[in-house]
A protein has these predicted regions:
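Long, charge-dense, solvent-exposed interaction surfaces that engage phosphate-rich ligands
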Residues: 280
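ASCE P-loop NTPase motor core, strongest for the SF2 helicase catalytic module
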Residues: 54-275, 284-305, 309-311, 316-369
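Charged, low-complexity intrinsically disordered regions
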Residues: 1-63, 245
Length: 369
């Protein structure tokens, strides 16, 4: 057909024009060795295209897509000691629907919009439905500084949920007897062999940018812990590059975006290097059911939030600090200026290193109590 059609061929009672590029794409589809997996089929359904060609969906697939993109409100758990704002209700309902279908969620609201409350509401709902029970509990992984905050927030908004902090040198998994275990990324890495033997109904990670580097031992440890439902919380799901988002999505919905190599080829490079708007549009479509992000600057989200007020407060250095600051700066500048206008790459690298060392030393002097 590719050799003889010359762009126009007869199909049933109609003539169809197909460009050479279209034919090459079709040939690639029909000659590929591996059939599409379930995630690739879902991406095709969500984007409405395959290899640039529009697709038609069956009634069953349309029903699944409608369920994924539904905005139907889910009843709040009875024991919740809080009234959710409309946008929080939407976030809670969205995470609940995803969890019941079998997908993970990335809640990426701006800081201050109540991500923790929305997730606590989910945990309570799942406990009331007996998804979280004495045989399968919930694991919440947070930075060390947030352990107590999480425990207090759960006690405040969902007092019927019992918690246990798994942290410190005396920690013992055998002593765990609660609905929710609270632990840290560091402990997750140290105790991953024990934690992944436990049956978890839900696993939540707060400040999910802690697993943005997919190659670190910490990220691998977190992802190795099995859970039926996964939720990631982050106000900054992408800080520098799209591979960070891939790593978080690989935690919530493993395999959905393919391997990191394929992801870089199909999405990261076209978006970051070539700013391909078509790829950006497709990428947004395929991730939208699994990530929700609302901004404080969006007045349609929260109209009664007051404008941010900044107040600058200046602290003076003590005489001892000021003298040490000046002495350190002069000594460092003398060494740095000794390099002159050197253009040798190695010398430039050394000079840059000395500048960074000086800045760090000056910051330490300013922070001295």
């Amino acid at each position: 057909l590719m050799k003889h059609a010359s762009g126009l061929f007869r199909f049933k009672e109609n003539y169809i024009y197909v460009s050479e590029a279209d034919m090459m794409r079709l040939h690639k589809v029909f000659t590929q060795e591996k059939p599409m997996n379930a995630y690739q089929l879902l991406q095709t359904a969500l984007s409405g295209e395959y290899e640039g060609a529009p697709v038609r969906l069956t009634a069953e697939v349309k029903e699944l897509i409608n369920e994924l993109t539904s905005d139907k409100e889910i009843a709040l758990p009875e024991g919740l000691n809080a009234a959710l704002r409309p946008y929080q209700q939407r976030g809670y309902s969205w995470m609940y629907r995803n969890s019941r279908i079998g997908f993970g969620s990335i809640i990426a609201d701006d800081m201050g919009l109540g991500k923790t409350l929305q997730v606590i509401a989910i945990l309570l709902k799942l406990k009331e439905e007996n998804v979280i029970n004495t045989r399968k509990e919930a694991l919440v992984v947070v930075p060390t500084g947030l352990l107590t905050n999480w425990q207090e927030e759960i006690a405040r908004f969902a007092p019927s949920i019992t918690t246990h902090i798994h942290h410190g040198t005396a920690r013992d998994l055998k002593r765990f007897d609660a609905d929710v275990m609270l632990t840290t990324y560091g402990v997750c890495r140290s105790d991953s062999d024990l934690l992944k033997k436990h049956k978890w109904a839900v696993m939540v990670i707060d400040e999910a940018q802690n697993i943005k580097n997919h190659e670190t031992a910490q990220t691998k440890a977190v992802k190795s812990i099995p859970a039926e439902i996964r939720i990631a919380m982050s106000g900054t799901p992408v800080e520098n590059r799209l591979s960070e988002f891939w790593s978080i999505m690989d935690y919530t919905n493993k395999g959905y975006l393919g391997s990191i190599k394929n992801f870089n080829q199909e999405y990261a490079a076209p978006i970051q290097v070539f700013n391909d708007e078509q790829v950006v549009h497709k990428f947004r479509k395929i991730i939208s059911p699994f990530m929700m992000r609302r901004m404080k600057s969006d007045k349609s989200i929260i109209s009664d939030l007051p404008d941010k007020v900044e107040q600058n407060q200046y602290a003076l250095l003590t005489k001892q600090q000021a003298a040490l600051y000046e002495k350190t700066m002069l000594a460092a500048m003398e060494v740095i200026e000794g390099f002159g206008e050197e253009t040798d790459s190695q010398k430039l690298f050394q000079r840059q290193g000395l500048i960074l060392q000086m800045i760090l030393a000056l910051k330490q002097i300013c922070n001295h109590p």
